[in-house]
Amino acid sequence: MIKTTLLFFATALCEIIGCFLPWLWLKRNASIWLLLPAGISLALFVWLLTLHPAASGRVYAAYGGVYVCTALIWLRVVDGVKLSLYDWTGALIALCGMLIIVAGWGRA
């Protein structure tokens, strides 16, 4: 389960980077060349999703919990926003949901 969780975090990071770089280009007038690494990051994101052994819908559902946590880490580290109690609580609930889904992969 640790390997799956780490793979989900890597996947989420690729998705966030792949979306953040075009956001920088559009919102902050960053270089259009940021679209190249963004495309690579999003392609890597898609490829990483294929490495999970479960049905795609189950993978996407479980991945969502890790994405929430990764996005909040990004919010704190990159955007410099202090996380609230609601952020922490929501992340914990999302992560618990992911763990429940992943625990049932072999039984479904």
UniProtKB/Swiss-Prot annotation:
Q: Which cysteines are joined by disulfide bonds?
A: none
Q: Where does the protein end up?
A: Cell inner membrane
Q: Topological domains (Periplasmic): residue ranges? A: 1-5, 52-60, 106-108
- Domain of life the protein comes from: Bacteria
Tell me which Pfam families the record gives: UPF0060 (PF02694)
Q: Which GO terms describe its cellular component?
A: plasma membrane
Which coarse location class applies to the principal site listed for this UniProt protein? membrane
| Bilayer topology | Multi-pass membrane protein
Give the record's keywords alphabetically. Answer: Cell inner membrane, Cell membrane, Membrane, Transmembrane, Transmembrane helix
- Which HAMAP family does this entry report, sorted A to Z? UPF0060 (MF_00010)
Q: What is this protein called?
A: UPF0060 membrane protein YnfA
